[in-house]
Amino acid sequence: MFYREAGQFYTSYAKDQGIFQLKQDKYGLWGILFIAFVVVPVGLYLMVQGGLMAASTKDYLYNSIFLLLLVNSMAALGLNILTGYCGQISLGTAAFMGVGAFTAFKFSTGLNYRIQKEDEAGELVSELIPLLPAIDNPILLVLIAGAVTAVVGVIFGLPSLRIKGFYLAVATLAAQFFLVWCFSRVEWLYDYVSSSTIQIPPLKLFGLVVTGSETVMRDGQQVTIYPAAETKYLICLSLVVFFAFVAKNLVRGRIGRAWMAIRDMDIAAQLIGIRPLATKLLAFAVSSFFCGMAGAMSLIFYLGALEGAEAFNINESFSVLFMVIIGGLGSITGSFLGAGFITLIPIFLVVSLPWLGGQFGIPVDAAMVEHIQFMIFGALIIVFLIMEPLGLAHLWQIGKEKLRQWPFPY
């Protein structure tokens, strides 16, 4: 069989402790990355050029499915570090994503603040004054958003030093409601706009338009250049792949072992020299860093503009939690599997339920689809918690072990 360790052996402890125990796993990952970075963009481009797909369909796949999947994967990675590896329950993931989004917006506009002064007629007028030069690099904005969110996460992670379990979940839920209230009430966060709407200004990376538009002169005529969906997709994909690799190495090292010791039994971990204070706060910081980047990516690449804080409500926090539970707690792979499952199931239901209802003469509207979606998610959570607590990642691991042993039953 092709999936065997026969002929593969290691001559050093470093290689024996590598991420991939089988070469097939490494080749499989490289194959997935090749498909994501090369096959998908080139394939969709050729399909559009060949008339097999409309350009609007291609843009829909990028803007409504692929980008959302990448943003959810980044958020699930962050929550899995905190809940899956360190055992600290959080219901404030969406709020931390909101912190990242608003941070990216403020730094992209130079941290504007409003002053009032008298004009020539003696009337008071408002003027926005930037504190810093505006940042127009989207990757730098994402990193800054993650860093600021990490600080906020540490502040709201302080209760974990005294409480845990259900009580910690309630504390993070309070953080969720408080931060969402700030997003709607603190005028400075949305540049004092009456509609509470924020919109990322035009950004460029390596000369490519990422957000907004750019007008240039070509052959004596003005041409408006809009951001290509492929550009946003490849930037997001690069960020997710890089930080997934960082997370994988982080949880396999000394820090990750300390997190898992706190998760399994915090008293025993303290007895062997692990400091609960630093370990838990570091988990909150790293988790919030990932969630903040997810929020910034959502605003910059996926949404573009945001009205109030509706995109970061409590439902989004539960959705990310469902991704982690269904995908597998304490698994980097499970974060991607759960994000893919939770992201694609609603799209499948939106397409299939109206068609299925039409076959039986039952009208199915958007509200009914949403209710059925919640019912399915709730049922899946119960099923996975009872029958497969380790999630889809464990099923994937079992499948690989069965493949290695085939055709023998042991």
Q: What are these model-predicted stretches?
A:
Residues 1-410:
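Transmembrane alpha-helices and adjacent helix-loop boundaries
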